[in-house]
Structure formats: C-alpha cells, structure tokens
C-alpha cells in the first residue's frame, strides 16, 4: 500500500528521534556526559504563536489519535511540540475533523449514485471538503485536492457524455423498431398479394384450357360443315353422280314403255317421244326393225 508523504515524513522523524534517544543514552553512560538541553527551548512562545494553527487543533490531535499509532506521543509532545504539530498536521487533518470526513463520504456516494452534477456543486464540494485543512500550506495537499476535484469533474463530464450517447442510441433503437414494423407490414401485404396472384393464375390457366377445348370442337364442326357443303355443291353440278336422284327418275323412264306383265313381248310401239331425266326428248325410239337393220348394218 502506498503511503502518503506525511506518513513517510513522520516515519523518518520517528526513526530519527529513536536514533537521538539512543545517542543520548549512550552519552549519558559515558563518563562526563550530561543530558542534552530540551529541544523545545529552540522555540519561544512567540514562535509557537506565529504558526497558523489554533490550540484546539492541538488538543483535538492529542485526543483523537489512538495510542497504538502514537506509542510515544507524550514524550514527543514534551520534547518537540511545535515540530510534532507541523509534521503531523497534514496527515491528521481528516481525523481531526470528522464532519469533513463524513461529508466527503456522503459526497462520494452521491457522486457515484447520481446521474449528473454542476460546476457549482463541485465548487461547494471543494469548499466543504477543505474544513480545517483549507488553510493548509502544504502543496501536496493542495495538489491532491485539485486532482480529486479534477477527477470528479472529468467523471461528471464522462457520465454526461455516456448519458447523451445512451439517449441517442435509444432514439435510434426506437426508429429502427418503427422501420422494422413498417417493413414487416409491407412484407405481409406482399405475401398476401402473391398468394392472390397465384390463385388467379391457376384460375386463368383452367379457363385457358377450357377455351382451347372449345376452340378445337369449333374447328372440328367447321371442318365437317365445309365438307358437307362441298359435297352438296358437287351434287348440284352433276346430277348423274347423285344416286338418290337417279333412283327416283328410273321409274319415269320405264313408264314410257307400253309393256304388260303377262303379254309376250311384241316389240316396241311406234316411235314416241321419250322424256329424259335431263329434260331432253329422244325421238324415234328404235324397234326391232331398227335393231335388225342396225345389226345387219354392222
């Protein structure tokens, strides 16, 4: 554990006093050696009053410091009261003022637990923490107090920066959450639209297949109608190719012949005009004479 300069000075002073006591004891044992004059004879009452320390401080010092810390406090006070007061003032100032120590602890707890402070608080804290030590002329104590105040001010500024950064991060988090909710809503709408589009696509595909079947059936019907129309047109141009029309006109040709079913065939009647199916007339129907003549002529 690192010791403060006042403690180091006190230890050096204490070891020096012990060395002087040993030297005095050795001188007393020597023949002709006498005791040394008291060291406080070096300082007069005016010199002691010139120091800026009150008598209450000295009385408080002797009443507060435990005996195990100052084992030879009475002898030291008797031999070097002024030097003792000067050397130990900086180290026991806090112990001499319990109110200042309590205030220091309270301020430290408030600084650690609080969120922020102000410059006026720091100045008032410095004034309160000084207590009886504010009149100290030791530069180490002054530097220590200034360093402590500077550290607390730096910590306060650091806490302010951290709080501002934290507030900024919270604002960004809120914005990102809003954007996330908006994007999630858009994604849900897009999924719904995609599902609807897929359903409509299936319906349209089924409609297209049904229309294709209907178109194919219509094409077949058109092909059949064209074939029947072509056959009908051909039948109107050449009636001889129409079997129905020929079958209907055969009895008309036979009715022009005078033929009895039971009578023997006697030949054809005199030449008559025979109506042909085409509307023409055939004159001079040939008989046996013509037949025989034709055969003979052949």
Curated annotation (Swiss-Prot):
Expressed in developing endosperm, especially in aleurone layer cells. GO terms for molecular function: DNA binding; DNA-binding transcription factor activity. Residues 141-204 form the bZIP domain. InterPro entries: bZIP (IPR004827), bZIP_plant_GBF1 (IPR045314), bZIP_sf (IPR046347), RISBZ3/4/5 (IPR044168). Pfam families: bZIP_1. Residues 169-183 are annotated as: Leucine-zipper. Keywords: DNA-binding, Nucleus, Transcription, Transcription regulation. Signal peptide: none annotated. GO terms for cellular component: nucleus. Residues 143-162 are annotated as: Basic motif. Heterodimer with RISBZ1/BZIP58. This is bZIP transcription factor RISBZ3. The lineage of its organism: Eukaryota, Viridiplantae, Streptophyta, Embryophyta, Tracheophyta. The gene is RISBZ3.
